[in-house]
Amino acid sequence: MRHVKTGMAALLLAALGGGSAAIFVSAPAPAQTTVKLELWSRQDPSGPLRPANVVKAADRLNKDLADEGSDKRVAVAVHESPSPGFDDDALQLLKVFGIGQGPDLFIAAHEWICAFQQEGFALRIDDYIAKYPQYFGTIYPSLWQSVKCSIGIYGIPQDAEARMFFYNKKLLREAGYDNAFIEAMPARTLSGELTMDDVIDIAKRVISKTKARYGILHRPNKGPDYIMAFQSYGNNFADPGTGKLLLERDKLAAAFGWFERGVKQGVIPANNTALEFDALRKAFYTGNAAFWMYGIWDLGTYAFPTFGLPKDEARFFADWGWIAAPAAKKGGQAGSLTHPIIYAVAAHVKEPELAVRLLGRASDADLNTDHAVTTTHLGIRSEQLNDPRYAEAWPLARATELLKITKFLANNPQFGDLNAIIYTALQGVETGRLSGQQAADFVIDEATSSLKDVIVK
């Protein structure tokens, strides 16, 4: 792998008004025909193997091509953009495609894929997925929803996450719940027996029977995690037929109503959104809260190294656990939330089949596991559970079962703006300025006045 400057980098710098570009290149052995593919990737120290695995995949695909007797070989050049986040990166790339330029392949957050599809910049790949089951056949079926637009599939899921409700078993025991009840909570949640309001009831009992200050905590800023609660009440935020943002007043009011009840019953702090992230983590991991609505990566990033929770699987589950996001009503569907980063192929690529095959090879189980275990992400394939490295990273292996029921953010580029409105309304509910119904009305009024093509029901 070597650093080079290319015409692509110069083009991007000119189009985007400056910046820096790092290009990594894979060079094939001499062949009659070299197909050069350029990959756009955000410069992201938290996920360096996303582009690096594509570079590695070139060698694997070239071997496949040689074995097939083909005279074609692929070479990969990676442009790493300096964008601070995936939203900014997607907007920059849309501008580059908009002036008739751009890469052959790109990496993006999944909710942006339909923006590229709508502008004609992303290649539909359904037929290639069906043609090459050796590349795509064992990717978890649920993950394909994250790269689907109204008329087809336009990307390949590169990784996944799991979000859940962590809970403190020690506090539940102190509150009088027996081990049979505590250990059955995950299964009862998945079966639809344990509901969102049951979580409030459990948290309320913990506060009344123990010294814990908090019942349920969630992130203090805008993000995906609390969206799980909205999805439990049936809010999917996208119209399946058109991909437009969808707001359903009754379902929004029901979800905000859960937070409202949590605050009124004293289990969700009214100042949750004013607290520091570290203070919320500390409260949960030091035994001062019953539930923590967050994601699996927090164990390896904070719980184990910072707060000393046991790394051993058996010792961890003796006193800690997690459940999926419960259903709103008994018999309903529990859920989880994941936010995949994805690979995609540009519509203008000259060798679309080779491009898709390359990304298929970049999604090989061993390469994806390299990324998963070094970044605390879930793998995308069932066979990764058999990799000793993945099995050793037991939080990932255990949380993978949630991919069967996982849900996603809406594949709409305006969802980030909508989420900001939802978060503002959530602050209003928790501080007592808005009722659940008023919060729903606020979200709909703000979204319809500031966003485009919002469907309201």
What are these regions (language model features)?
Residues 5, 14-118, 130-133, 175, ...:
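Conserved N-terminal structural module of periplasmic/extracytoplasmic solute-binding proteins
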Residues 33, 69, 171, 175, ...:
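Extracytoplasmic/periplasmic substrate-recognition and gating elements
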Residues 95, 103-104, 134-172, 214, ...:
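A structural signal for short loop-to-beta-strand junctions that line the ligand-binding cleft
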Residues 108-164, 197-198, 317-326, 389, ...:
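Hinge/lid segment of periplasmic solute-binding proteins
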Residues 126-139, 181-191, 235-255, 304-315, ...:
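Short, solvent-exposed loop/beta-turn-alpha elements that line the ligand-binding surface or hinge
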Residues 150-159, 163-165, 191-245, 251, ...:
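Extracytoplasmic/periplasmic solute-binding protein
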Residues 318-327, 372-428, 453-457:
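Long, aromatic- and glycine/proline-rich binding clefts that accommodate carbohydrate-like moieties
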